[in-house]
């Protein structure tokens, strides 16, 4: 490994993605009253007390025929900790999402970096648009781990050197790699989350195949678990109709 000055701070390597549901206002009944106002008007809230099976059928109908707006009358806010390269993909999702991310201008960034664990498939086989990932060799895993650690140590040492010399944080951060962990709040509704999941997770029930990078899929899986707990009928209808956002 590259020699690093003895007084250089240690770095932390992680391979996980963390997602915490911070707050929510999201239930299946939000979908029902939003849909029923079309025909029941001011009586739509009374409709919520009717047969649960009828409610299940209505949600499935809305999902199947892609009547999407009733799925927007809810909110979920997640706190996500992930490498910057994950957030670059994450923030391509703009409609129905709001973000606030940790700032490298206003605080000193911590030396926490991503390194894949042994379960991460390393080798891509096939051509663009038609490929699979396969297991890496022990030698490849060792190379990835050592190369990443060396690079991270060097980059963070340089970052610290510039800060110590009085260089502004917004300038010094330019040397830090996309493997650096960041954190953000991400707020969405069920419809925007379903669109995210349709693109960023693989699932046997999906009508349309998706090929997400594993690290953003890990974030998606954790968000989906929270959403399924909050809105079980809506989640079941999403799966039953091929995991296509309405």
Swiss-Prot record:
One of its GO terms (biological process) is methylation. InterPro entries: Thymidylate_synthase_ThyX, Thymidylate_synthase_ThyX_sf. A motif (ThyX motif) lies at residues 92-103. Gene3D superfamilies: 3.30.1360.170. The active site is at 200 (involved in ionization of n3 of dump, leading to its activation). The keyword Zinc does not apply. It catalyses: dUMP + (6R)-5,10-methylene-5,6,7,8-tetrahydrofolate + NADPH + H(+) = dTMP + (6S)-5,6,7,8-tetrahydrofolate + NADP(+). Residues 17-241 form the ThyX domain. DUMP binds at residues 89-92, 101-105, 173, 200. Pathway: Pyrimidine metabolism; dTTP biosynthesis. FAD binds at residues 69, 92-94, 101, 189-191, 195. Its EC number is 2.1.1.148. One of its GO terms (molecular function) is NADPH binding. Its cofactor is FAD. The keyword Transferase applies. PANTHER family: FLAVIN-DEPENDENT THYMIDYLATE SYNTHASE. Belongs to the thymidylate synthase ThyX family. This is Flavin-dependent thymidylate synthase. The lineage of its organism: Bacteria, Bacillati, Actinomycetota, Actinomycetes, Kitasatosporales. The gene is thyX.
């Amino acid at each position: 490994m590259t020699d690093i000055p003895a007084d250089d701070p240690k770095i932390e390597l992680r391979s996980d993605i963390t997602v915490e549901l911070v707050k929510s206002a999201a239930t299946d009944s939000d979908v029902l009253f939003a849909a029923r106002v079309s025909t029941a008007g001011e009586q739509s809230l009374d409709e919520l007390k009717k047969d649960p099976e009828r409610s299940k059928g209505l949600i499935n109908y809305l999902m199947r025929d892609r009547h999407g707006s009733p799925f927007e009358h809810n909110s979920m806010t997640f706190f996500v900790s992930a490498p910057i390269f994950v957030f670059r993909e994450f923030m391509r999702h703009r409609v129905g999402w709001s973000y606030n991310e940790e700032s490298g201008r206003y605080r000193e960034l911590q030396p926490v970096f991503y390194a894949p664990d042994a379960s991460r498939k390393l080798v891509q086989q096939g051509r663009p648009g038609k490929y699979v990932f396969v297991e890496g060799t022990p030698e490849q895993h060792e190379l990835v781990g050592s190369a990443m650690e060396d690079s991270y140590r060097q980059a963070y040492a340089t970052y610290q050197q510039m800060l110590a010399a009085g260089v502004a944080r917004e300038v010094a951060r330019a040397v830090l790699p996309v493997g650096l962990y960041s954190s953000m709040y991400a707020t969405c509704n069920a419809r925007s989350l379903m669109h995210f999941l349709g693109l960023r997770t693989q699932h046997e029930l999906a009508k349309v195949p998706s090929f997400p990078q594993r690290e953003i899929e890990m974030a998606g899986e954790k968000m989906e678990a929270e959403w399924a707990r909050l809105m079980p009928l809506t989640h079941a209808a999403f799966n039953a109709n091929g995991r296509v956002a309405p």
